[in-house]
Amino acid sequence: MIFINFYNTAPDYYLQNVAIKNISHKYNFVKVFPIGKSLCGRKINALSIGNRKNPVLYACTFHGMEWFNTLLILHFFEEICCAYKERKIIYEVDIFEVLNKRGLVVIPCVNPDGVEIQIHGASSCPKYEKLINKITDNTNHWQSNARGVDLNHNFNAGWQQLKKAETEQGITGPAPTRFGGRRPFSEVETMALCNFCLKEKFSFAIAFHSQGREIYSEYKDPPKRSIELGERFSKYSGYKIANPPKIATGGGFKDWLIGYMKTPAITVETGLGENPLPASDYLKEYELIRKALVKCLDF
């Protein structure tokens, strides 16, 4: 690996950008571009490799405490770049051949402001510092974006039903987690991802969250390939297929992809324990899902 120190610590916005820059410098065939910006103006970066005419998407870190997945996906992307350059075969998958037919796009961090708040506190988002401090005096368990909206409750898929579930739990305004906003797509981060998906029309997508070692592949009447994608990831990782709790049903990225775009999609909950999962656990978890990440490229 080319930046060992990066993988041993919580990847804040600065470290993420250093890592992305190092990857793009080492592998000149990698394209790096922002799909949009956060409320505080931080870039929501994407990296791509291969044939963008037939792309798949791996998107991570919708929540501030879930930066663990940024480590996982950048490690994977770096390994895939190396295999592509050196024409390696991994788990019987010819990476060069597959990526010439199908491009891979990864978004290491959908919610850069949320990660900064969780790692560095409210002062990392000066424009919203007063609001954040009003919401909580402890940002160690911050999941939302800078104005207290949970991005994975903000997509237009069963949003009204999800609002009822939020209200039942006493969540009626900006919060560290699980407040879906005043309307669907009210947040610049969710709109950026929505517009990007409408433009790219991905063959399938995987949204990475933590924790639980579970896979969610259903929403209402999902495409058959969503179910098959979930089964494939489960087969090669050992993660179990499950259903999310009521408070996490609807409003999510995977739900919107399935319900509106009719795009096969799954949610993968990585790791075990309590968020934020420690960076020291990432390598063990990576080895557990590495085969599934590779095999799904050839799905």
Segments from the language model and where they lie:
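Structural recognition of the beta-strand scaffold that forms the well-ordered cores
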Residues: 34, 45, 57-59, 105-108, ...
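Proline/glycine-enriched tight loop/beta-turn segments at coil->beta junctions
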Residues: 50-56
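C-terminal accessory segments enriched in acidic
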Residues: 1-19, 26-32, 88, 161-299
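N-terminal carbohydrate-binding/catalytic regions of secreted carbohydrate-active enzymes
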Residues: 31-36, 40
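Active-site/substrate-binding loop(s) of hydrolase catalytic cores
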Residues: 53, 67-68, 75, 81-218, ...
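A short loop-to-beta-strand scaffold at the N-terminal edge of the catalytic core in hydrolase folds
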Residues: 40-48
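Generic recognition of short, well-ordered alpha-helical segments
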Residues: 44, 68-72, 228, 280
